[in-house]
């Protein structure tokens, strides 16, 4: 991992369909000395509940990030983006992860267990956590995203 960003903490959540990939992500980041807190289910759960848990933690903890996993990542990304201040991105490859950090300052990464293999997920995590926000013209665009949420 090139020059990894060191967030204050990474919050990882998944529903039952993303549990195995979420556990892999947890171990991968712990091996790189990231501070991790997990919200992983012991039974069948509803993904919006876990998206909410992780997003609330990210909003409460400056300089933290979230990772959400479900079967496809779609439901988690939809749920996460309902929160003002959350910029969640469903990433399917390292380029998407790099660009969402560079241009969108994403603070929540969404992954799909049935979509991405372990090798791809490793490259996504490396790109996401080694790319800094470019700022510049992108700051106004992000402000406009938050303005569109009335909550």
What are these regions (language model features)?
Residues 5, 11-13, 17-18, 94-151:
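C-terminal binding/interaction regions
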Residues 6-8, 62-64, 85-86, 104-106:
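Short coil/turn connectors at secondary-structure junctions
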Residues 13, 39, 69-70, 91, ...:
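Structural motif
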Residues 17-29:
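Short, solvent-exposed amphipathic alpha-helices that sit
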Residues 23-26, 79-82, 102, 122:
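Short amphipathic alpha-helical segments
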Residues 33-37, 86-93:
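Short hydrophobic/aromatic-enriched beta-strand-loop microsegments
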Residues 35-46:
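A short beta-strand-loop structural module common to alpha/beta enzyme folds
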Residues 50, 54-90:
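Helix-adjacent hinge/juxtasegments
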